Regions:
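ATP-dependent carboxylate-amine ligase
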Residues: 1-3, 11, 70-71, 147-333
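A transmembrane-helix-recognition feature enriched in membrane-embedded lipid enzymes
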Residues: 1-44
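A secondary-structure boundary/capping signal
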Residues: 46-49, 138, 169, 287
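Rossmann-fold NAD(P)-dependent oxidoreductase module
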Residues: 63-67, 139, 245
């Protein structure tokens, strides 16, 4: 879905009109978060958002998976497979499955580590464990009570923050902020903006870690694209961040087109972009997540990979190691 503009401005007529509905939605969401869930039998680390849309969860999952492997763990991702038609549980096969089957994010992640898609998260736990998981990484699901979490890391974009701070549909929040803050174990702030500073101060005041991080583009791809004029397009939570990252890398963005998050590209849309790039002598560039939905055109579109780097990796490592130790201590008979 494409987020309405009033979600990211000062309180407006639109948001005020929707506040009664938001109050009802928020009350239901808060009550749902209080339910008990399945104990997975292995530590569960959840990477989530307070709000709808993207903020950098997928790069965070990849960074955590890398760290967990360094710690000697076998992480397996558990996802609902948003945008895919398979209810699961199913292990994602990057050769056999398409984004329309399992969702674009799980398909992209499956190129790096084992991923299980299950519309009902609890049903996916046995399959994740069957893949040898010593740790389950939940991609999203912070507000879901289906599986007991041993650590919840919340990702916030430092430029966007929490928008107008209202609960859906008056704003972007998935539930009232207070109960979400109480269930947060660590905050990951992506970028150098100030929009998340107030939330960071509240989390820090609770004695919980605030982890600063930034997206780092692939140096080889940046070198390849410098000197070229590009036509950039993206159907992610915040396409503007992608376009700005290209420009900050010294790449000339001669044209850009933004689509809604998880946009199901039509053949006509892609052929139109390819034709425009050809006419204007531009290189067509998109995100890795978008390219997962565009396999048939992968030879004509250049992906722009990014990784998440933490400013204080030792702090992240200590947090994760401590959480794993405590989780296993609780699960011992």
């Amino acid at each position: 879905m494409r987020e309405p503009r009033f979600w990211h401005g000062a309180p407006s007529v639109n948001s005020n009109l929707l506040r009664p509905l938001a109050a009802l939605y928020g009350a239901i969401a808060e009550r749902r978060m209080q339910r008990g869930g399945l104990d997975a039998g292995v530590p569960v680390i959840c990477v989530g958002n307070y709000h709808v849309g993207g903020a950098g969860k997928t790069p965070t999952v990849l960074a955590l998976a890398k760290l967990l492997r360094e710690l000697g763990e076998t992480p397996v991702v558990l996802s609902r497979g948003y945008g895919g038609k398979l209810a699961g549980p199913v292990k994602v096969d990057p050769v056999r499955h398409a984004a329309s089957d399992v969702g674009d994010e799980p398909l992209m992640l499956a190129g790096t580590l084992p991923v299980v898609v299950s519309r009902k998260r609890a049903d996916g736990v046995p399959l994740a464990r069957a893949q040898g998981a010593t740790v389950i990484l939940m991609d999203d699901g912070f507000q879901s009570p289906a599986v007991v979490k041993d650590a919840s890391l919340i990702v916030i974009d430092s430029e966007r923050g929490l928008g107008n701070g209202q609960v859906f549909p008056a704003g972007p929040l998935r539930a009232p902020l207070r109960p979400q803050l109480a269930r947060t174990d660590a905050l990951v702030i992506v970028g150098n903006g100030a929009a998340a500073d107030a939330v960071a101060a509240e989390i820090a005041a609770q004695g919980k870690p605030v982890l600063r991080a930034h997206l780092k583009p692939d140096e080889a791809q940046v070198a390849q694209l410098r000197g070229q004029r590009v036509l950039a397009f993206a159907g992610i939570g915040d396409p503007t961040r992608f376009f700005n990252t290209l420009r900050a890398s010294g790449i000339e963005v001669a044209g850009q087109r933004a689509f809604a998050d998880h946009h199901p590209y039509s053949q006509a849309e892609i052929e139109s972009l390819i034709a425009k790039a050809g006419r204007d002598g531009l290189t067509l560039v998109t995100t890795e997540k978008d390219l997962a939905r565009l396999r048939d055109w992968s030879q004509q579109i250049v992906p722009f990979p990014v990784t998440l780097e933490f400013d204080d990796p030792a702090l992240l490592r200590k947090f994760v190691a401590d959480r794993l130790f405590k989780a296993r201590a609780r699960k011992e008979p």
